[in-house]
């Protein structure tokens, strides 16, 4: 069977001599798989080591600051080609040489190294205050996505997946080279790329192909199998399709106990820009519609709002029956219990949607009972007529039992109304009754804290202060005040509202407008003060970290002549600074793409 030449054209920036050696090596490897030659006669393992060494030397000579990424991609492509040619043979012909047995372990090492460098490119850029260009960041994100998806399939054929990884890597290198020629890359970004994109360590990569007797690379299958059995193993992944006895071996790069990493502060930026993003939103949007919309930011908060106790029923089901009459006379009647349950569901569905205040009423008494005298003699509230006059001008619902934009709130049967939760106020004596005022449910003595954006001056204030500032004017407050109306006591009648004062009631959407206005004032006053304090050196804990070694490296590069060739040998002090970064072996396997995507513009790519 002829060698598969699909991936030979995907290598990055190789000389014709290296391409010729590479083609000869792949042909000899296929002949070994066909049992035309032996692995020891053509020295497959030693030639594989030399070709990987040539990839690294070529990347150091012509790859500039991102040569480590180029070398990693070329090595990954080379071992993927060997892997694809091996699995195309029959089982009895494959697995008789050292490279075929150790290929899954080497592939795991290379993919792990590729994921590490791409993760560090996104994670450590904010902590070092490095701005990633949009086109480079988008191309790097595609490379990271393909690499992470294929990390679950170490023992599978890479075929098309190999081509996707190499195509994404080629786009990254092309964008870097083009922007470097146009002078669009700063010296700080170049130093950051040289720090992040490290070269693979060939000694660790070929550790499974070293003979335990001689200490050199070997093609003896028995020595390789004996060495693999001594390596630590991991549990099989459920995503691995074709499992083998070497697919669970961990590379040595993941088992390093000696910490060589330099302390680099990891600070995910974006908290400072969160206020600006929130200020850009429309401040006049309806607070109620945003809360109940399916795609809004209050959608996850509706579960707690729907489970609030209804203002038309007591918190304890048996409290009213104990006061009004004999609770044991008809408590066992199943028909009456179903009627009460349906009435409670209907009352709870109507309560949070009414736009005008209503009087408190008791539930219908059971058959054979008499209504409570205290509730029967309660006079009609005088402020209901004023509310009806206002509702005639601006109707919201044609009928309270048929809302126009909200479905009825359903609740499972068997759950008592006195259940407690994290967002539910605990029942207390004299304050268990809640009222509905201007469409908002106000529970006494506790309320649900409204949403305030991070950084808002109301975010860390107490609940009464966050709901409304301390009034300093007269008793009748103007429109726009956030002070909630006084809640009447349970036994006292509510104060009357005249038609002249009905237009002075607060707007439920005014709270959002006030929050946006406060954020804008904070952006005009607080943010410039923070920038001035950071410039003077008076930094707080919320400010970016102080200038580190990378800024020192940038200052050193900028102080040199403009015609400095970065490919030439550097000065001793510059080499000392670079060694501090290149020894960093920080294996960060946590994906934080959101930091990189926040500055991307996919329309440019």
From Swiss-Prot:
Residues 341-353 have a biased composition (Basic and acidic residues). Signal peptide: none annotated. Residues 307-381, 447-501 are annotated as: Disordered. The keyword Ligase does not apply. The keyword Manganese does not apply. It comes from the Viruses. Keywords: Activator, DNA-binding, Early protein, Host nucleus, Host-virus interaction, Transcription, Transcription regulation, Viral latency, Viral reactivation from latency, Virion, Virion tegument. Disulfide bonds: none annotated. Residues 321-338 have a biased composition (Low complexity). Residues 355-364 have a biased composition (Basic residues). GO terms for cellular component: host cell nucleus; viral tegument. One of its GO terms (molecular function) is DNA binding. GO terms for biological process: regulation of DNA-templated transcription; release from viral latency. It is found in: Host nucleus; Virion tegument. Interacts with human ATF7IP protein, leading to promote and regulate host genes in virus-infected cells. Interacts with RNA polymerase III complex; this interaction downregulates small RNA transcription and 5'-pppRNA production. Immediate-early transcription factor that controls the initiation of viral lytic gene expression and lytic reactivation from latency. Triggers lytic replication, and initiates a cellular senescence program in epithelial cells. Up-regulates human DCR3/TNFRSF6B by directly binding to its receptor. Globally induces a proteasome-dependent loss of SUMOylated proteins in the host cell and the loss of promeylocytic leukemia nuclear bodies. Improves the stability of the triplex capsid protein TRX1 by reducing the ubiquitination level of the latter. Belongs to the herpesviridae Rta family. This is Replication and transcription activator.
